[in-house]
A protein has these predicted regions:
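Carbohydrate-interacting regions of secretory-pathway proteins
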Residues: 1-144
Length: 144
């Protein structure tokens, strides 16, 4: 069993940093437990994770077919010309619970052989369609 078989998507800030949206309801993030459950993916790729960089502080995924909510507070990396002078930062709430607090993003997230995505100061907010049906609603963007 791998969690993408139960749903897999994500939201990308500036096209470079992914917060994973996937069905990991009821999975235990303790390493001993996920090995026993025959999971193929580690918790830093589970729902609510900053993909490949950091697992959520708590698995806040609701049961399948429940609407999930995410609130993201994101500050892009800063650059002086081509030189990065400060890392991006993100705070994430899932279903009303803080799961990442002011996490510093040392590099873009990425999966597969291409590795981390390039970091940029500005870019789109994108949503991933990754093999499973997914729906989004009530999307808000507030510039700060």
């Amino acid at each position: 069993l791998s969690h993408p078989d139960r749903g897999n998507s994500g939201v990308f800030a500036v096209g470079a940093y992914e917060v994973q949206i996937s069905d990991t309801f009821g999975l235990d993030p303790e390493p001993r437990a996920w090995r026993e459950q025959a999971l193929l993916k580690k918790p830093n790729t589970w729902g609510g994770s900053v993909y490949g960089l950091r697992a959520a502080d708590v698995n806040m995924c609701l049961p399948p077919l429940s609407w999930q909510s995410f609130d993201l507070k994101f500050t892009a990396a800063r650059f002086d010309g081509e030189q990065k002078i400060s890392n991006a930062r993100i705070t994430v709430w899932q279903n009303g619970v803080l799961i990442h607090e002011d996490f510093e993003l040392p590099l873009g997230t990425g999966g597969g052989p291409s590795g981390p995505r390039a970091e940029v100061a500005r870019g789109p907010i994108t949503f991933q369609n990754h093999h499973n049906p997914v729906q989004f609603r009530n999307i808000w963007l507030v510039e700060r």
